[in-house]
Amino acid sequence: MPKIHELASVLADQIAAGEVVERPASVVKELVENAIDAHSTQIDITVEEAGLQRIVVVDDGDGIADEDSEMAFKRHATSKITDRRDLFRIKSLGFRGEALPSIASVADVTLITSTGGVGTEIHNVGGIIQEHKAAEARKGTTVIVKELFGNVPARLKYLKSPATELARITDIVNRLALSYPTVAFSLVHNGRELTRTTGRGDLQQVIAGIYGVQSARKMVAISGQNPDFRVSGYVSLPELTRASRQYISLLLNGRYIHNFQLSKALIAGYGSKLMVGRYPLAVLDIQMDPLLVDVNVHPTKQEVRISQEAELTQLIQETVFKRLSQENLIPDVFDEVQTKQPETKTTDQLTMALNDVSAKYDMSDRQVLGAQQMPSESVAQPSDAAPVATSMGQPAPLQTPEEVPVEPVVVHDKRDFATPAVQRFDAKYRQEQVAAPLGQSAASAAVDQPAVEATAPIEPVQATPAQRFPTLRYLGQVHGTYLLAEADDGLYLVDQHAAQERVNYEFYRQAIGEVSDDEQKLLVPIVLDYPTTDVLELTNHLETLASVGIHLDSFGPNSFIVHEHPTWFKAGQETATIQEMIDWVLKDGKISVAAFREKTAIMMSCKRAIKANHHLDDQQARALLQKLATAENPFNCPHGRPVLVHFTDQDLEKLFKRIQDPHHSGDDWEEA
């Protein structure tokens, strides 16, 4: 008797279901995607007991003809592709023909469908059709799934708690709603409505319905394109962040995908505007020719392979960076407080006005780019779019300008570099600090007026209009840590450490952030030992390391020797710096000298910035504000913390009860 035999179709379906149907959320995803492919405009999802007891998906799509209804339950039966060439131009969400038979093999499934005439009802249990009959039904399809995994109870023990499984279902529906704002979605669990969208095509209104109105108001529209890709959507301002990447939705030709490199590019677009360990909210819609993407990678179709991915990541990073550069990134104090308050979602969120950047998301123009139809003219897009400073000890009080020449308001440490080239630039920096306090450049110091006496009138600090930075008038210092200033639109509180850190960072980034060929010969070479696997990997990247000044020569089977290093390496830390860059290569397979030097600039800017409890005189404080106003990004320190916060006039009036509370009766209100 032969040992190799063909599996029964029902058993084969159950095996395939292990990849397609992992949990109740997988069932919801597959059924809703089928409804979208059927051109539905209204999709209603009802689940009971987190989907384990019952899942119902109702749509108003094209429906299934009676003659095709049984075929829909067969493996690899689909209407979405016909031949091999279609695999390279997939425009639908589904195409493998596995979803319905996989679901039916592990559940009790009822299909009710109609194309507009007499409907059809099919009852399938465990992959076997039990009944096929005519039924009264409106145009569209209803799929009822009961007793999921009832015939494979071993699968149940791998599921999480009902709350976790329900959260996964909600997440899937929310992602699909963000992908298709022209489709009205509703999700109901045990009689309680969890999600509802209007299907009006306004992406920002969908964001408001999912994440809340306050979050939607802090998101801005982005748009960018190149010959192969078109990017649009919404990203949050740096003040609105979350603790994980899960609030980043990447949509590729209408399909929600997971792609670490694209998420990384989006985050890189924020630069130093994000705090460490914080991530933005974003909905990024990417349109491209289907020829440039392979979605036939995994049965869930959430992992894809993208051709020319490097060009796409660059486009995303540049688009986000340019858009955020146009925004005023000063957080409002009361907005920060309000976002921490519990927010009760109501259906009013779906229709209320958000702000001027709210725009209709024209899905009629959201076409998949074809090889012969690349973007050339118009592009469908959304239109119009205090940290607690750690005390480092009480420093000696600063002397006044009348006693001695103004000293730089920096922490004077020992020389950080030992090489002559860097000593020259470091000396130049210190001279500029003496001539222009708190990092003022020689160019700006040359055009400034003579030093202001302590008794002179306080002049407004002129800001750069392009940065939308306010014109600040210095008022005083609070606890040797914060500078108080006023502007025409209210009161500003400036973190002096973060402010000088930003000023120093931009100086160092320009001074040492450019690649140089200067190298320092070592009297005693550095020997580095690595495992054989790392040595073999490093041999593939010797040219890359050499391009940034790290020349590794073989020194035995498991060692390298280094005879020289770039002059900008910090004295005493040459070995650690080289090892860090080598580890970077081993981890990522590539290295960016510009990014590494930027990290160095961030480190030095923090070390040389004034700390908390460091009292400044009026001249030094005004000099710091003046320099901050000319910074490229005056709103955040290099680590992403805010440099200043804003109290509007209305905020101040609320604090002193000069504005009537809308919930307070006005009969006994006294107007000041």
From Swiss-Prot:
GO cellular component, one term: mismatch repair complex
Gene field: mutL
Function: This protein is involved in the repair of mismatches in DNA. It is required for dam-dependent methyl-directed DNA mismatch repair. May act as a 'molecular matchmaker', a protein that promotes the formation of a stable complex between two or more DNA-binding proteins in an ATP-dependent manner without itself being part of a final effector complex.
Top-rank taxon, per record: Bacteria
Positions of region (Disordered): 371-403
InterPro entries for the chain: DNA_mismatch_repair_CS, DNA_mismatch_repair_MutL, DNA_mismatch_S5_2-like, HATPase_C_sf, MutL/Mlh/PMS, MutL/Mlh/Pms-like, MutL_C, MutL_C_dimsub
Family listed: Belongs to the DNA mismatch repair MutL/HexB family.
CDD domains with a match to the protein in the record: HATPase_MutL-MLH-PMS-like (cd16926), MutL_Trans (cd00782)
Keywords, sorted A to Z: DNA damage, DNA repair
Protein name: DNA mismatch repair protein MutL
UniProt key word DNA repair: yes
Pfam family, one: MutL_C
Biological-process GO terms, alphabetical: mismatch repair
GO function terms (MF aspect): ATP binding; ATP hydrolysis activity; ATP-dependent DNA damage sensor activity; mismatched DNA binding
